[in-house]
């Protein structure tokens, strides 16, 4: 831990303007867990492990009665051959995917044969849906019943990579209210301490 995160030992002291802060969700769970033994990590390492796994993350969200696109776990190539009703869809690695990486658009069963997919990894197949737009809601939770929820942000992508975000998002009052309520529900259920972005 000392070699990986030398700043851990300084984190218990009040420090102003000393370090840059960056956002990256793919920090190994074991690394965060070791740091957590020395200095409390917030949000909890278990939260980071959950959001790093697309299948576990979607299972969690659906248990909160928040709808996602239809999805199914894929362990081997032959699994897809029985799932024609999920197509067109997007096959995604369950871990380490971001900015379009680890994603394979599949229009029909035959497409699987033409794609270079390593089935030794875990995958999730998501039913393709036509999105009108993507929004993000940022929630900062300090503790039980202590949080701030910020105005939704509208995101525009090019080739699956975020290019622009704008405020205010052009959304209905219904979508506004629902997005704020869902974001709060997720943060509360996770017992999240810190700042969370829900897309």
Predicted segments, located by residue:
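Internal nucleotide-binding/catalytic subdomain
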Residues: 1, 106-198
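Structural detector of well-ordered beta-strand residues that form the stable sheet scaffold
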Residues: 41-43, 69, 90, 124-126, ...
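Glycine- and other small-residue-rich loops at beta-strand/loop junctions that grip anionic moieties
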Residues: 16, 46-50, 69-73, 104, ...
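Acidic/polar active-site rim loop that often engages polyanionic ligands
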Residues: 60-66, 92-100, 157-168
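Electropositive phosphate-/nucleotide-binding environments in soluble metabolic enzymes
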Residues: 17-25, 29, 51, 55, ...
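Conserved N-proximal alpha/beta basic substrate-recognition cap immediately N-terminal to
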Residues: 28-85, 96-97
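Active-site "cap" helix and flanking loop/linker of ATP-utilizing ligase/carboxylase catalytic domains
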Residues: 5-27, 37, 178-198
């Amino acid at each position: 831990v000392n070699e990986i995160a030398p700043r851990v030992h300084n984190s218990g002291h009040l420090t102003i303007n000393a370090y840059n802060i960056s956002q990256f969700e793919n920090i190994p769970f074991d690394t965060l867990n070791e740091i957590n033994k020395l200095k409390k990590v917030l949000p909890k390492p278990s939260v980071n492990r959950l959001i790093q796994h697309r299948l576990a993350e979607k299972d969690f969200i659906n248990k909160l009665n928040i709808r996602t696109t239809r999805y199914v776990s894929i362990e081997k190539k032959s699994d897809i051959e029985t799932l024609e009703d999920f197509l067109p869809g997007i096959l995604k690695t369950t871990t380490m995917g971001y900015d379009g990486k680890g994603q394979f658009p599949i229009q029909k069963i035959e497409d699987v044969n033409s794609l270079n997919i390593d089935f030794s990894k875990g995958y999730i197949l998501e039913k393709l849906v036509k999105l009108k737009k993507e929004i993000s809601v940022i929630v900062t939770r300090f503790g039980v019943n202590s949080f701030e929820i910020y105005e939704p942000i509208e995101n525009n992508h090019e080739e699956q990579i975020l290019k622009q975000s704008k405020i205010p998002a052009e959304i209905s009052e219904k979508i506004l209210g629902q997005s704020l309520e869902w974001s709060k529900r997720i943060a509360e259920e996770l017992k999240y301490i810190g700042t969370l972005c829900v897309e």
